Amino acid sequence: PSGQIADTEWFHTLCQYCDENNIRLFNDAAYISLSYSDDCSTLSEIATDFPNLSWCEGFTAAKLIGNGTGWHIGAMVGSSDFIGDLKEVKGKSDAGFVAPMAAGVLVALEEDQEGIAAYKIMYKQRLSTLSGIMENCGMRLAIEPRAGFYTLWETPKRAFGEMISSSEEFNFLMIENTGVVGVHFSNYLRYAVCADVDAMRDDVEIAFKNAQVSY
């Protein structure tokens, strides 16, 4: 729900625990190219120090190149036993390998790191812009985003002059009264920055100001 990172120390502790307790370890590193911290590490960098660990890390092509919507192809790396089992399962369930997309991703990774970096900067700026707007309108971040393009917010106790009982209620009130659509679950709301936030800055600000939220 909110892009976060794991550093080397955290992965080392996790690998050691899983190794000692015979636990298989999988990490979905889909958003690694959209991480906004130099402390960000990957499981692949650490797991090789644990030769008996059964592990695997997955990477999504769509996110590796910035946000290539529809580029549904990925890559995995890991211990031979884990990869072997995944090959058995995926080989009997997938529709097949999309070679043109795989080739395109390789070209982007090898020849257009500047383009990928530009998307990373763009999403980071959008996250900052949206967070600033919503916080100025009284919304409360659940956690600061450190990767990806999602923001996670606590559900207000009051909005539009009435008490709010759930994130679902608040989301539907926002949709009905302002047209702003979020994703509600548990007691949180998620808002993405996949569109040009600056272009809709005024509309977003007006929407959340009209909500008159409080906690």
What are these regions (language model features)?
Residues P1-C40:
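Active-site phosphate-binding strand-loop segment of PLP-dependent enzymes
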Residues C18, M134, M174-I175:
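A generic structural signal for well-ordered alpha-helical segments
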Residues E20-N21, C137, T178:
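Helix C-cap/helix->beta junction micro-motif
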Residues N27, E57, G182-H184:
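Hydrophobic residues in well-ordered beta-strands that form the structural core
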Residues T48-K124, S128-M134, V213:
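Conserved core segment of the aminotransferase class I/II
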Residues L106, I121-M134, L141-R158, H184-Y188:
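Conserved glycine-rich beta-strand-loop-beta hairpin in the small C-terminal domain of fold type I
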Residues M163, F172-Y215:
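PLP-dependent enzyme catalytic core of the Aspartate aminotransferase-like
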